[in-house]
């Protein structure tokens, strides 16, 4: 089995031809992107052919999305029963790489469609209840049981879409996370001012 791991972005600029080559040559592909607009394009262009060939295209496997995606999956499996919502709170230190910074600037002009909280989901897999409970939040607040202040996490917009896609794909494979499952991600800060 051949696998290509790509770790340098912006992926919308450098990754499309690489993914196309992987599908053509029947190699699996994974990367660390947070560029959901680009991932949506990959899904539209390559999902069916890759699936028919048994090829896995797995974007968003870096530090940004993996804790949220695997964390939600782990939570569901540990409960051993249907779960309707998972919220995660990330406290992070450090900054962004040059590629991440460039990506942030290129995403500013995205269409309303690309800002959809379910942009990565398979078509017709979203209920009205899920849509209502899955809006991007920019509120700063204190939550019972969580020490500190919660606010918008730097990668929340990217990560929430990744987790929602995973949940939808699991549901299509008869392994649902829960009825009308929703997911939220928040930054965790020591003071209100930092949030």
Predicted features along the sequence, with ranges:
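Rossmann-fold NAD(P)-binding glycine/threonine-rich loop
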Residues: 15, 20, 33-55
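General beta-strand structural signal in soluble alpha/beta enzymes
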Residues: 31, 57-59, 88
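Gly/Ser/Thr-rich loops at beta-strand to alpha-helix junctions
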Residues: 36-38, 62-69, 93-94
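C-terminal catalytic/substrate-binding lobe primarily of soluble NAD(P)-dependent oxidoreductases
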Residues: 54, 77-195
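Active-site-proximal alpha-helical scaffold in enzymes
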Residues: 68-78
């Amino acid at each position: 089995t051949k696998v290509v791991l790509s770790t340098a972005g912006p992926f919308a600029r450098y990754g499309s031809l690489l993914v196309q080559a992987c599908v053509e040559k029947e190699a699996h592909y994974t990367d660390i992107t947070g560029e959901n607009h680009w991932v949506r394009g990959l899904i539209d262009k390559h999902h069916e052919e890759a699936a028919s060939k048994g090829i896995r295209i797995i974007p968003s496997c870096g530090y940004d999305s993996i804790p949220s995606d695997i964390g939600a999956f782990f939570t569901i499996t540990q409960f051993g029963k249907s779960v309707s919502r998972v919220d995660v709170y990330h406290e992070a230190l450090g900054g962004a790489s040059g590629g991440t910074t460039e990506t942030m600037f290129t995403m500013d002009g995205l269409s309303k469609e690309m800002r959809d909280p379910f942009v990565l989901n398979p078509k017709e897999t979203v209920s009205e209840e899920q849509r209502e409970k899955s809006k991007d939040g920019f509120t700063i607040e204190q939550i019972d049981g969580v020490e500190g202040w919660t606010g918008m996490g730097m990668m929340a917009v990217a990560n929430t879409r990744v987790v929602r896609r995973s949940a939808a794909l699991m549901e299509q494979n008869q392994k649902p996370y829960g009825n009308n499952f929703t997911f939220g991600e928040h930054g965790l800060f020591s003071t209100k001012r930092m949030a």
